[in-house]
């Protein structure tokens, strides 16, 4: 599989940005190492362009008639190789060359048909969709692997998704032009599409993993046989006798949750919290939304069950950097061959200024979905998060967005990044 053409641009006028993007992908499509006949486009726009979503899709699809399938969404920020766009009008595009029988675009009005055997799926969703968590779990069950990746659209204006399949519109969507609001959409992939995906956490535990002994709905009343509020105050070393200090610390604290089945029986802290002191990829970070002093209970923004593991945590930039570098290194080590020809070694060893995507990395393209609360500003500077990805993963075609919640496996995460790469093995 050859490298996927990709591009990104910013401009106050969407037509100018689209023109810049089209020029970039067309220039790549004539290069030997890049795919020349892609049929699937992944399109992400910032919310500055949300009101023009239909016009953007119509224009790009008319300019790229050979690309018959489109998927994507809107974000308060978008990402590409080595760059992030926040609070400015921008778009990014990647063109994927995959066997036509190995992927299907779907949406709420044109769901995935029974005739396609999905192995995994890229999912975009609207956070306002009723029973969203259940829909994500149901979609995961539709795949052989049970693995989804993607995120929730994030926007300060219109929350839109792109989904166009086949020669024009998806069969069944009627007069809809490929821009949707609400529900789920995305791309399902067959088993011959090589994908490697990892979740990177952004929070650091500040307590051991506790066992939830008693809980009702989103209220936990007992941890390890003790009142949950007492455990929280002890772990954070604060007291309600000094309410201002206690509330300030608690507001900066979140909880990491793991279900018993995912925690291998919940027998050990090392399951939810690894030997490095970081959360495992199955831990879901949620907000503390209230305290109940009368019942000595803690309320969180998710449903709780007895037997779950719960650890208190806080956002930590250094831990987030280290974990992001770790997942990039894991993917790189898994895909790069042990022996490379001299030409490839020279290309991969090029300086950052001279670097360019190369097939020898084993990566045809990548999708990165990060939390809208992460990104460069959180990591210390403009585009800092994507610069970390480039240094650790290498120079690869990449697009993505900053989401209102990240999807991996059958879960909805927060404060994480989900990095997925298309391997360049032949389908």
For each feature predicted by the language model, list its residue ranges:
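Contiguous, structured surface segment used for ligand recognition
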Residues: 56
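Small-residue-enriched flexible segments
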Residues: 1-50, 59-62, 67-366, 371-378, ...
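Charged helix-capping and loop-helix junction motifs
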Residues: 382-385
């Amino acid at each position: 599989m050859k490298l996927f053409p990709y591009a990104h641009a910013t401009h106050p006028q969407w037509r100018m940005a689209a023109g810049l993007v089209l020029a970039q992908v067309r220039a790549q499509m004539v290069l030997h190492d890049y795919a020349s006949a892609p049929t699937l486009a992944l399109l992400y726009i910032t919310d500055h362009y949300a009101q023009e979503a239909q016009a953007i899709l119509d224009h790009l699809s008319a300019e790229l008639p050979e690309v018959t399938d489109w998927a994507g969404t809107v974000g308060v920020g978008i990402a590409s190789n080595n760059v992030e766009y926040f609070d400015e009008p921008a778009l990014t595009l990647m063109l994927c060359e995959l066997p036509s029988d190995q992927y299907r675009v779907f949406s709420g009005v044109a769901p995935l048909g029974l005739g396609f055997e999905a192995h995994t799926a890229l999912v975009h969703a609207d956070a306002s969709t009723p029973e969203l968590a259940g829909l994500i779990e149901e979609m995961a069950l539709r795949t052989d692997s049970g693995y989804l990746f993607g995120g929730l659209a994030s926007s300060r204006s219109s929350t839109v998704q792109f989904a166009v399949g086949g020669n024009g519109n998806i069969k069944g969507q009627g007069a809809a032009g490929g821009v949707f609001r609400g529900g789920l959409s995305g791309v399902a992939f067959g088993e011959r599409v090589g994908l490697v995906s990892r979740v990177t956490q952004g929070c650091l535990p500040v307590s051991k993993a506790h066992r939830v002994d008693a809980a009702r709905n989103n209220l936990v009343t007992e941890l390890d046989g003790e009142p949950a509020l007492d455990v929280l105050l002890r772990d954070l070393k604060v007291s309600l006798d000094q309410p201002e200090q206690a509330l300030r610390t608690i507001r900066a604290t979140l909880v990491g949750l793991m279900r018993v089945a995912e925690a291998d029986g919940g027998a050990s802290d090392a399951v939810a919290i690894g030997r490095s002191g970081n959360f495992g990829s199955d831990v879901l970070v949620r907000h503390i939304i209230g305290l109940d002093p009368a019942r000595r209970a803690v309320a969180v923004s998710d449903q709780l069950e007895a037997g779950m593991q719960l650890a208190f945590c806080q956002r930590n930039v250094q831990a987030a950097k280290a974990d992001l570098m770790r997942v990039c290194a894991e993917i790189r080590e898994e895909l790069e061959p042990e022996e490379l020809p001299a030409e490839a070694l020279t290309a991969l060893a090029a300086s950052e200024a001279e670097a360019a995507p190369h097939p020898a990395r084993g990566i045809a393209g990548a999708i990165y979905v990060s939390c809208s609360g992460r990104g460069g500003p959180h990591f210390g500077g403009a585009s800092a998060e994507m610069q970390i990805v480039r240094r650790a993963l290498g120079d690869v075609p990449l697009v993505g967005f900053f989401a209102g919640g990240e999807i991996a496996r059958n879960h909805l995460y927060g404060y994480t990044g989900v990095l997925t790469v298309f391997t360049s093995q032949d389908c």
